[in-house]
Every structure is written in structure tokens, then in C-alpha cells.
Amino acid sequence: RRSRGLGDVYKRQSVDDEDIPAVFIDFSSTNFAGPTTAINIAKELKALRESGKRVIAFSDRLSTSSYLMASQASEVWVHPVGSLSVRGLGGMRNYNKELFENLKINIHNYSQGDFKSATETSWRSNMSENDRIQREALLFPIWDEMKALMAEGRGLEAKDIQSFADDYVGFFGEAAIGNIAYAKENNIIDGTKSFPEFRQYMIENFGRDEEAKSETYKTISFKEYAKQINKDLSFSGNHIAVITAEGAIMEGEISQGVAGLSLIHI
């Protein structure tokens, strides 16, 4: 059974709503999204776009996760001096063997088995082959799915996304401070607009909000839109609701990579 979340409700409602000609998403604050969340949102945006609804993405900066989601929009705009940081998945670990040796600290590792990399940073000076194998086994399939979604959304091939990620710095160009020009020329984005230019673009397409104190376009936030949804969207009957939590379960509020206990009741 397909999951039913708030995003699914908004998508189904906006598709059928003739008063909503387009959906605009600002991805400037979406670095919180991990791969799983980003992939799920990207698929929902893809379905929304394929339904015929115009989806507009704009941001002054796009990371790997936020570009994955933005790539599913009908059009993707970035600030002329913004950034497009599509660099794939990965990470770095600090290996402190020499540090502990210089500090005369003895590390005793009590572990058994081949794939026991949790303590390697304390007694190795580099990544073990087994650790590399398990990390590649985890990350490569996820990155392949992300590349495929990005490429499909922009009418490109996965190898084009891989090339862009591999040569992130090389695509800056002479005297450039970012790779936006390359992205524009190669259909990774549709183009660039400053904040005033984008505001004017939206006004021309959707009209000016006469009730706003400053010049802006007609829009309604998803929170305000939710208040106007009057359809019966309840799922009655004998259903089991599953609330998913991503990250380490720790005390406190929910944050990036942390499933806060204060909002999770088991």
C-alpha cells in the first residue's frame, strides 16, 4: 500500500484545484532533507508535474538534495551569483592513530569480525577496505537513483549529472565564482534570475497581489492553503498509521539527523 502523507494530500488537492495554476517551491531552506526524504519528495513533485500542473523552483543555492527535488519542477531558476552544489553522496572521517600515539594514549580495540569500522578512526590512519566496501554498497545505489531522477527531470542522461558532480570545481570557468553559467548552458537549470527579476516574472505570470503592502505576486502558503481544504480527507476504518522517523533517537526536539524523543511517543 502506498503511503499517504501530508505531501500526498496537498498534491492531490492542488492537482484538482483550478484556482491553483502553479505550485512554487523555494528550495533555499531544504538542506535538512536527507536522501530518503529528498527522493520521496522528488517523486511527488514529478507526479505533480506530469499531472499537468506547472511547478516552479527558485533558489539562491541548491545542494545535492535540494537540486534533486528542484529538478522535478517544470522550470528551475537560480540566482545569478548563487551556487549549485551537486556533488553526490559521501563523507570524510578523521583518523587519529598518529594523534593518539603522539599524545602517548593507548587505544585498545575489542571487536571481532570483518566489518567493524565504528572504532577505526581511533586506531587506523586510513579507511579499511571493508569499510570502503560497505559504504559503497550503501551509497552507490542511492546515488544512482538520485542521478536517474535528476536526469529524467531535466531531460538529460545520468552520465551528465555524474560529470557535473565529478568536475564541480572545473565547471566554474575562468574568473567565475560559481558553475551557474555551465548549468544554464547545459540544461541543468532553466536560467538565472535575481530576486527582483524573479518577483517581476511571477507578477507577469500570475498577477500582482493588490492586498500586499509591498510589490509581490499572488500566492498562498501551503499552511494557509491547508486551512481551505474542505474535502473529507480522513482515512476512516481499521487502518494502522505508521509514523516514520529518520535519524538517531535522542532526547530533545527533532532536528537534522535526529529523531527527537519529545515528539516521538513509543
Across the structure, where does each feature detected by a protein language model lie?
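Single conserved hydrophobic/aromatic residue that forms the stacking wall/gate
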Residues: 1-13, 264-265
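Membrane-embedded segments
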Residues: 11-75
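Terminal peptide-recognition signature
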Residues: 25, 70, 135, 183, ...
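Second-shell loop/turn segments in exported
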Residues: 26-35, 54-60, 82-87, 120-137, ...
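Flexible, acidic/glycine-enriched loop-and-adjacent beta/alpha segments
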Residues: 56-116, 193-215
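Charged, glycine-interspersed solvent-exposed loop segments at helix/strand-loop junctions
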Residues: 93, 97-203
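C-terminal long alpha-helix characteristic of the crotonase
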Residues: 152-153, 171, 190-239
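Intrinsic disorder and flexible/low-complexity segments
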Residues: 228-263
